[in-house]
Amino acid sequence: MSAHLNEVRNKSKRKWTIPLTWFGGKAWLASKIHQYTPSHTTYVELFAGAAHILFAKEPSPLEVLNDLDSDLMNFYQVLRDPRQFAEFERQVNLTPYSREQFEECRDNWHTYHDPVKRVWAWFVIHRQARNGMPEFNWIYDTTQIRRGMAASTSRWLGSIEGLPEAFERLRKVQIENRDFREVIKMYDREHTWFYADPPYVLETRKSGKYRWEMNNGDHLDLIDMMLDIKGMCLVSGYDSDIYEPLESMGWEREIVSVHSGSTKESRQEILWFSPNLSRALQDKRKGLELISGKT
C-alpha cells in the first residue's frame, strides 16, 4: 500500500476527491445537498454518475452506489479493490497528458478485456476530454496556466493525485449495476436515505445526452415508487410538469440557481424533499438548537 494512502487514512479531517467529471454531475450542488443529510443508516445513490454527493458526505454504516452504466460501475469496482487499484494507479501515473494517448484510448478501450486496462483507458478518455464527455475531443490550453503548467495538464495530474482519497472513500461502498426500480425495492427501509438525480427530462434540456437515458414513462415510474417508499428521498432535476405529483402529495421543493455546464447560462435546479425527509431535517435542526442552547 502506498505511503500516500497511509497519509490519507491518518487525516482527522478528510477532503474526499471526486475522481470524475460527468454530464449532469452535481459538484456545484454537493455542499448544499450535504446540508440536507438526515439521520440515516443506509444511503443509496440511485443514479450515481460521478457520485458527487457520496464524496461530499460523511460515510454512513451502509452505502450503495448504483448506475446502469456498466463501464462507470466497473471503474468504481476497480477503485475499491486494493489489488486492482494498485495496478490502476501505477498505470495512470505512467500516462502522459497526450493527444496521441487520448486518441489511442478512445479508439481501442472497448477492445480491452483486462478489467484494469479497460478502466485505465476509460479513465484517460473521461479525464482528458472536454467536460469529461468522450464524444468530445482532447482538451488543450494555449494560454491558461495552473500550478506552473498548462491548466489541462494540471487537472489531469490533480485527478491522479486524488485517486488514493477516492479509493479510501469507496472501500466500504456497495456497487450496484441495476435498474433503479430493483434497487429501490432491495434497499427500501425506514432509515434509508435515497438520493435520486435521474437523467434530466428530455424536454427540459437543450443538449447533451447520457449513455443511459430515461423516457417519460421511466420518470413516472420513479415518481410512483418515491410516493410509496418507507425511506426518505431527495430528488433533483430541472423543473418539469412530470414531477408535479410529488408536490401534490406533500413533497416540499427548493429552487437553486445554477450555471449550465461550461456556459454562463443560468438555469434553475429543483430539489424535492419527501415529507419524512422534511420531518427528519426539522428534528435534526431542533436537536442542534437544543445543543447550541446548552453551550
Predicted regions and their residues:
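SAM cofactor-binding core of SAM-dependent methyltransferases
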Residues: 35-109
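Serine/threonine-rich low-complexity intrinsically disordered regions
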Residues: 81, 141, 274-278
